[in-house]
Each structure stands twice: as C-alpha cells, then as structure tokens.
A protein has these predicted regions:
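Conserved class I S-adenosyl-L-methionine
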Residues: 73-82
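S-adenosyl-L-methionine
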Residues: 105-140, 144
Length: 204
C-alpha cells in the first residue's frame, strides 16, 4: 500500500488511500461488496520485495528452513543477505525468542535488505550488519549457519568454531566447482552428515 495506486486482479487500478484507512479484519464496502483486509503472510512479503540480487526461490527457502530445523530460540548466522528474501523467512522461523544475524558486505545490497525488512512483522529478530563475514571474524555461538557466498569453503573453520553441538550449516551455491571446493575443505572435520541437494522447481 505504499504506492499511490494499487492493482487488484479483475478490478483494475485505483488510489490506495482508501485501503490505507481500513482496519484489518473489519468489514467495509468495496465495489458494492463486503470486503476486509487480512494480515499479510510470508508469501505476500516475498512477492513485494524490492529486487536487487537474484532472490532465492520459495522452494529453496522452504528446503533450507526444514533442513536446518529452525525454531524459536535459535541463533542463525546468514552471510550474503542479497535482497532479504531468505532473511525475512529466517526471522519468521526464529520468532519469538530467536535471532538472525545477517552479514552483507555490499552497502547497496545491505540497504535493499534493510528496506525489505520493513515489510516483515518479524524484523526485530534480525541484526543486519553491513560487514563481511570472513575467517577472521569473531566467533558467534549459533545453532545454524547459511552461506550464500561465492567461496563458502573459506568459512568452514569459522563455522566449526561457532556452531554449537548438533548445529547445522547450509551453503547455497550454483556451480559444481564450488561444491567440490566446499567438500574438499570439509575433509577431516568429523562432521556427522554431509548432504548435497539440487532442488528443482515446477510451477503449474
């Protein structure tokens, strides 16, 4: 509703000021019919994000959250905030007692994430930092780590020192060369499970 006009399918474009005045879950007359505003959900947030870097798909986000077994009370480290699509989902998964610490070294991308977090009712769970996470960064005790970076293998040592017992790490990488470098860096760390997945998406 930040736009001056809003488009509703099968109705057309009209000034958004009218809807801004309505209260959630309270009926009002709209095009001669009863209507009401309902609270937005994560899917609505994802569809309205300001675009910057390529956004992680909703299917991949769901896979990441499921495999990290995220829950309230967890501390989650995210490196590579991008446009904040994953950040908003992690924040919701960690609510109300958990927190997400997101590192984004690009000022441009950091500012995009900051703007997009305003759409989320769970933004208070996020500590957004305009910093690079690297092997020399101070260790942060955490339950989960998500790396969306070109060279995640350089952070394996940092991750091992930061993760609590039973903690998990997900690396979101697009090329087989990156996978090979990561697997090579994991040798000898005594990890209980290493899993490689290539999610596919089919919208019908």
């Amino acid at each position: 509703l930040d736009s001056n006009t809003i488009e509703i399918k099968n109705f057309g474009n009209f000034p958004s000021e009218f809807l801004k005045k309505q209260k959630k879950n309270v009926k009002f007359i709209f095009f001669e019919k009863e209507a009401k505003l309902i609270p937005h959900n994560l899917s609505d947030i994802q569809k309205n994000l300001l675009r910057g870097p390529q956004i992680i798909s909703s299917k991949d986000i769901a896979w990441i959250i499921h495999n990290l077994d995220l829950k309230s009370g967890d501390t989650i480290i995210e490196a590579g905030g991008g446009s904040g699509a994953l950040t908003t989902a992690l924040a919701q998964a960690a609510y109300p007692e958990g927190k997400v610490i997101t590192f984004e070294k690009s000022k441009k991308h950091h500012d995009i994430v900051k703007i997009n977090l305003r759409l989320s009712p769970f933004s208070d769970q996020v500590d957004l930092r305009n910093e690079e996470l690297n092997e020399d960064s101070p260790r942060i005790e955490c339950n989960s780590i998500v790396l969306d970076l070109p060279e995640p293998h350089k952070l394996v040592s940092w991750a091992k020192e930061s993760l609590v017992s039973g903690g998990k790490m997900v690396c979101y990488i697009p090329t087989i060369n990156q996978v090979e470098n990561l697997l090579s860096s994991l040798n000898g760390w005594g990890l209980s499970l290493i899993h490689i997945s290539e999610p596919t998406r089919q919208d019908r």
